[in-house]
Curated annotation (Swiss-Prot):
Gene that produces this protein: recA
Residues that, per the record, bind ATP: G67, P68, E69, S70, S71, G72, K73, T74
Designated name of the protein: Protein RecA
Record-stated family: Belongs to the RecA family.
Domain of life assignment: Bacteria
Gene Ontology MF: a single term: ATP hydrolysis activity
GO cellular component terms, semicolon-separated: cytosol
Pfam families reported for this sequence: RecA, RecA_C
Xref: SMART domains: AAA (SM00382)
Chief location bin: cytoplasm
Entry annotated with the keyword RNA-binding: no
Task performed by this protein: Can catalyze the hydrolysis of ATP in the presence of single-stranded DNA, the ATP-dependent uptake of single-stranded DNA by duplex DNA, and the ATP-dependent hybridization of homologous single-stranded DNAs. It interacts with LexA causing its activation and leading to its autocatalytic cleavage.
Organism, as annotated: Helicobacter pylori (strain Shi470)
InterPro entries: AAA+_ATPase, DNA_recomb/repair_RecA, DNA_recomb/repair_RecA_CS, P-loop_NTPase, RecA-like_C, RecA-like_N, RecA_ATP-bd, RecA_C_sf
Length: 347
């Protein structure tokens, strides 16, 4: 439907005035502006990249990764940092918990020499640092570990028994209102690691769990990932890692509620090779005959761990199988579920 000529002139005049005051592009017709593809940063997990729908976490958005203790939240975040750095990105880690293991981060592929790290004393200090580096325009990714550790100054200065109801929630709400627009403008991705708590007096239906820091983060986050440990990985009766399940419980850039499972090996992080084998077998790209796994005419090994070791050594072969998996699933198709039963015995 055509717009009245007088209205067109009035709108054009208003746009010129707005551009003069706020800068060009402050108000545009959507038809005049080319819709840009959403860029992403890989998570370091093939399955989770597929579950997120765009190949990773979106750039310029807020992401929340939450789950129980020792479920792999920080490990996943460090993998995202490593992937961002591989593509020339500048990353920062705000360590509010004062618990960053630099040696472990290095083993996951993080360039620790060029990683910006802050260990703030208060929640206000952490969020001020976050806002300053984001406004600089030079940062591609910031990870805050964790929301629960962003303690307001009033709580730190007060006595041990003092009640400070809602202080942290108000702090988070204020900070998110200020930085959301800046993140989009600077194309900076912000990841909040969060913990879960049990709701007090929860009765009847619904999940008894909730995340810390109030409701603001739930609304402002474009992606929320719930990660849980679901099994223990064993080899020769030795506990060598955990099996984790990540569920995308909120996604503003692709369909939500997709899931991915992957191995987190102690001292090594997410096992990409394990995912290649799992998806390869599911899609009939990797053949499984008894305990033996093979790809085309090449035997990968007897048992999952041996096959993983071979793929770890032969990067070219691992990349070839990964490409075939991505082509088989297709960018617009629903992600295929992983095998119901793992290929190796788990606890």
């Amino acid at each position: 439907m055509a717009i009245d000529e007088d209205k067109q002139k009035a709108i054009s005049l208003a746009i010129k005035q707005i551009d003069k005051i706020f800068g060009k592009g402050a108000l545009v017709r959507l038809g005049d502006k080319q819709v840009e593809k959403i860029d992403s940063i890989s998570t370091g997990s093939l399955g989770l990249d597929l579950a997120l729908g765009i190949g990773g976490v979106p750039k310029g958005r807020i992401i929340e990764i939450y789950g129980p203790e020792s479920s792999g939240k920080t490990t996943l975040s460090l993998h995202i940092i490593a992937e961002c750095q591989k593509n020339g990105g500048v990353c920062a880690f705000i360590d509010a918990e004062h618990a960053l293991d630099v040696h472990y981060a290095k083993r996951l592929g993080v360039d620790t020499e060029n990683l910006l790290v802050s260990q703030p004393d208060t929640g206000e200090q952490a969020l001020e640092i976050l806002e300053t580096i984001t406004r600089s325009g030079g940062i591609d990714l910031v990870v805050v570990d964790s929301v629960a550790a962003l303690t307001p100054k009033a709580e730190i200065d007060g006595d041990m028994g003092d009640q400070h109801v809602g202080l942290q929630a108000r702090l988070m709400s204020h900070a998110l209102r200020k930085i959301t627009g800046v993140l989009h403008k600077m194309n900076t991705t912000l990841i909040f690691i969060n913990q879960i708590r049990m709701k007090i007096g929860m009765m009847g239906y619904g999940s008894p769990e909730t995340t810390t820091g109030g409701n603001a983060l739930k609304f402002y986050a474009s992606v929320r990932i719930d990660i849980r440990r679901i099994a223990a990985l064993k080899q020769n009766e030795q506990h060598i890692g955990n099996r984790a399940k990540a569920k995308v419980v909120k996604n503003k850039v692709a369909p939500p509620f997709r899931e991915a499972e992957f191995d987190i090996m102690f001292g090594e992080g997410i096992s990409k090779e394990g995912e290649i084998i799992d998806y390869g077998v599911k899609l009939d790209i990797v053949d499984k005959s008894g305990a033996w796994l093979s790809y085309q005419d090449k035997k990968l090994g007897q048992g999952r761990e041996n096959a993983k070791a071979l793929l770890k050594e032969d990067k070219a072969l691992a990349n070839e199988i990964t490409l075939k998996i991505k082509e088989s699933i297709g960018s617009n198709e629903e992600i295929m579920p992983l095998p119901d039963e793992p290929l190796e015995e788990m606890e």
